[in-house]
Amino acid sequence: MKVPKKPLKVFFNASVVIAGIISPSGGSGKLLELVTNKQIEGAISELILDEVLRHTDKIGRSQHAIEKKVRSIFSPIFPTPSLALINIWKKLVIDIGDAHVLASARSAKSNFLVTLDRKHLLILQEKVRKFKIVTPKQLIINKIRDYIDYSKA
């Protein structure tokens, strides 16, 4: 008898949330749908929500509508990680403004950090060991098929 796997826990960077809302049929949108359908456990922090809300002009909807949508997908939304944890990750990142993303993914006990930020986060794939940093496509193709219960689809 197969032992059920623990749910896949994925921390979302703001870039993926924004792309998923703009294009629900793309890879980022498919991941948001999997979170909504409870096929994977999705996580964001308050700082990620704030970043998404700062970019509502790219999405073309009101800030209120975007916040309502994001909160309906991700629950709970994790608090901002401690400054001590952020400082640990500052030593690794290229842009210190991204340290909170890695700290949040770690404090949320995520298996994966999904991002579209090639310049600052995906470049760290080989350096981070506590979780995997991947693109939506990498996560869908290489990881999710092992975790999804297709009977819920």
Which functions belong to the PLM regions below?
Residues 1-25:
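Metal-dependent nucleic-acid phosphoesterase active-site entry motif
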Residues 76-122:
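Active-site neighborhoods of divalent-metal-dependent phosphate/nucleic-acid chemistry enzymes
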Residues 49, 111, 118-153:
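Acidic, PIN/NYN-like endoribonuclease modules and their adjacent C-terminal/linker elements
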Residues 49-74, 142-153:
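Extended, non-globular alpha-helical segments
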